[in-house]
Structures are given as structure tokens and as C-alpha cells.
Amino acid sequence: MAKTTTPPKKKVKKKKVLSADEKGKLKREKKLHADILSFFKTSGFEYISTNGKEKKFGTIPGELDGVYFYKNVIVIIEETIGSDNDHLRTKVDYFQKIKENKEEFLQWISQLAPDKFGFPTEYTTARYHLIYCYASETLVSEDISERYPEVKFLGPLILKYFLHLARSIRYSSRNEFFKFLGLGHSDIGDASSSTQPRYIDSAVIVPEAGTGFPEGINIVTFVMKAQELLDCAYVFRKDSWESAIGQYYQRLVDKSKIDKIRSYLASSQRTFIDNIVVTLPEGTSFTKLGADPHPPEINIKDLSSISNVQIRIPYLINSIGIIDGQHRVFGHYHGGDHLEKEIARHRDRRHLFVTGILYNSDKYKESDKRIFESGLFLLMNNNQNKVKPDLLQYIETLKSPRSSLGIAGNVLMTMNNRDPFKNLFLLSPLDKVGIKTPTIVKYGLQGLVELSVEKETIFKYWVNDNKLKLLDERYDESLYQEYIKFCAVSLSQYFNGLKSQYKDIWDLSNKNSRILTSTAIVAFLKSYASALTKYQEVNDFLFFKDKFEKLTIEFTKDDFSQYGSSHWPRLAARIDLECWV
């Protein structure tokens, strides 16, 4: 009988055991990818998986983390949780080769996902827009973003914003994302549908006269279709991707409110009678309705004395600014929910009453417009749905930038971009973790940065020959920004001196640490004023590092319990006693 031999057992490859750091990194990578995927899919883009698929374009081989497309708009995504600038430069070089070999790229993604993306399509190769987005877990510095202007940087706050927007208004969030990408209506879809200028025409119901508004602001009432507003409207949300440039004042869209309005629209079969308040774009014109096919334009000042007037508004993406009524407009959003079929029947037929504000561009620059609008927004909203303290402070900062509150708000936002408070302040409801700011601004910063040479303020000790010009009504904006930066740098050096003594507990995730609480920060700001009084000058990091070595306070949960939420005077007195002697 032949002897049987047992085949040798295959060696089972042991699964690599990940360290805690590796597990944490993997978890963060998965979270970033899931958020990006969720945004694009919720807003109506198709996804093509390219991760792990190497492809050479020109002379450069490389990989892409993902490709998303809508019609002729293709977004190439790079996902990273690191901050390797050389890695970014390599990726940008690779993207440039993709653009140079566009048709080859389109054929490649068609081969990867033929069921989603067939090529050739109804669009010519030239009609496709290829846009490179760098999605990072951490903020990219200004130097880097300026070095690569062709890249759209999808930082953590911007991604959170668009994800929130997409979850609230689904496909209608695309319009704002297109603006972020630098695209307009004419760039999207078939070129034949975008060669001629489009307009929104409507009969003027009431040309408002005697409104009491300042000269150069004109008011007119008319109707618009919900679809037209969805296509052309934008909102100056404080927490949006554009908020870094300032002058934005509105709240985030509220998903629960949108859902309630959407249910009402679907069940009631009627529109709202409350007016949507908007700003109208440049290029808006007025003509008299009649037999003349080419009627002459009417000056807006003459509207109140003329009947049968038509308003003509350019049909442009993100051109009509909503001051009040964003939820009533976006309740009509495009989306794949169970109400979409009913809403879609009325979106292009249902008219909304609109009150439009038209500015004289010779008298109103953009910052002046936002100041007027933010005041109007507060007037219309604060009584019916109380504005939160942080947004209220922010709006006051816009309205009165040279007030102590206005300066304090701008200083705090500047400090949030610097160590030791970089990205630690809670400036947006999109942030779940952070240091709350209203108390810090009101009780800590406001008095310290005031434009006063009589009080113990940073302004008093600011060495600048031109500083008194800030007290004039016609002040120099660059001088104002110089003072904001001086305050932020000086206070950052002060708190960096403090951090050098408490670096082990300078961490928001440390549940036993109380050094990054509003109470502690207000106390240290009040003590900074005491240091100004004693030393009669603004000191630097090394000075404060040396002084804080004397501090014996332990900012632990138990030790800090004696200093309640508003007991900063006691804490400030102890800091004064131990440090400024």
C-alpha cells in the first residue's frame, strides 16, 4: 500500500498588530474619507474609486485618492492627515500632467467605472473642468495656499461647513460648492445652454418710497420663483468657507427648521406670504412694460411715479444675497428625500414675495453693505429667534469695528490663528470642542484693547507715532489692522510665557486641566492689565516666561474648584500677587 504524504501546512501570515498611534492614524484617515464621501454623495456627485490604482500621465506616475463628478465638473481629491509640503508639491505636479493629458485621464476613469462614467460623452474634452482639491485634517498655512493658487484647499472647517450644508439642503448645496470651486452657471453642463445671458424678469409690485433708509439704498418688492432663488441665492453665513475675509454675519442653516418648512410646503400646497429680503446684484435694471420690444431703462429713483414696471435680474450663480428668509427658500431644495416628488412639482411654479435692496455702488463699498445688512438682520431676527451671544458680538464687531467690543472680537479671531491658542477658540457651531469666547471678549479683552490713552490699555502703551489717527472718524484701515495684530501678538507672547510653565496640561482633551477655561483666561487678561500698570510697557515672551515661573497655582480640577465661573477677580488677584512683585 502506497504511503500517503500529508501536504505541508501553509504558513498563515500573521496579521500585523497595530500600535495605538497607528490605530489612531487609521481611524482619522477613515473619518476624513467618510466625511468627504458623505459630502459629495449627499450633494449629488458620483464617486469613482481610484485609490491604490497607479497611473502614469506624461512622465509622472502617481495615484489619486478619489474622483467625484457632476455633469462636466470633475473634482480630484487628495486626502491627508499630515502636513508634508513636499508631498503636496509632488501631487500638484502630477495634477498638472493630468490636465495636460485630459483626454487620456477621461478615458482612464471611464475604464475604471464604465457604469458611471462613459467616455466619450455629450461633452467635448475641452468642456470638462478638472479641479484639484486638497482635503486636509489640519489647516494649511497661508503661505502654502498662496504658493498653489490652482489648488482648492478643503480644510477641516470648510469640509465641516459643506457637510452640514449638504445634509441640510442636499443637491442644492452644489451651487455654493461651485462658487468655492470658482465656477458659474455657464461652466456647468452643455455649452449650448449657456452661450446667451439669462435673466430673471418680474413685475414690480411695490417700488418703495420714503423708507427712511440712508441715501443710496433703494427698496423694491416683486416675486420670484423658488427655483430661481435656489439657483442664484447665497447667504453671508458667519461660519462659511468665505468667513475668513470678514463682513459675514448670518447663522448656519438649521436642518430641523428646513425639514419642518419642507413638510409644510409639501402638505399645504401654498407658498409663504412673508417677504424674503435680499440684496440685488449689479446689473439689475428696470423697464416699463408695454408694446415697445426694447424699452429704455428707468432710473430706480423714478420708480415710485411709474406704473407697470419690470425688474430684470442677471441669472447668475450666487448673485442674490439673502438677508432674511434663507430657510423659506432652501426648504424647496433639490434632494432625494420622500418629499422630493411633491416639492419638485412646485419648485419652478411657486412664487415667493421678495423685497430687494439695491445699492448705489458709488456710495456703498462691500464692507458698508454688510454693516447695513447685519443691523437689518438683527432687527428682524433678534426678537423672534434670539441671536446667540457669540453671533451678536460678531455682528457688533462688523457694525462698530473701532468700538472696544469690535476690536476685542477681531483680536480674539487673530489670536485663534496663532500659538498658543491656534484653533482652540470655539468660533463656530460646527466646532464641537473649544474654548467659549463671549465671556472672554466681554470681560477680558474688551477693556484691555480699548482705544484709550487714559485707561490702562494696550493702546496706551502701543509705540506708534500715528496711533491717535485711529480716534478719527476717517481712520486708516491699515493702521487699524496694525493695532489688531499688535494686540494679538502681544497677548500671544504673554500666554506663550504661561504655556511654557504649564505645557503638560495645555490641552483641551485633558479633562483634569482648567487652564484653558474662560474663567482662567479672563483672569489672566485682567492680570495683564495689572502688569501694564506696574511696568508701564508691553513686555515680551521671555519677560513673562520668567515671571510665570513664580506661579504656584495648580490648574487641576480640584485645585481650581475655588474659582467659580465668575470668580476671575480672585484668581487675577492671586496671579498679581505671585507674579508682579
Describe the predicted segments one by one.
Residues M1-I60, F69-Y70, Q107-A113:
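Acidic-basic catalytic patches of nuclease active cores, encompassing PD-(D/E)XK
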Residues K3-K13, G58-P61, K71-V75, T80-V581:
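Accessory terminal alpha-helical modules
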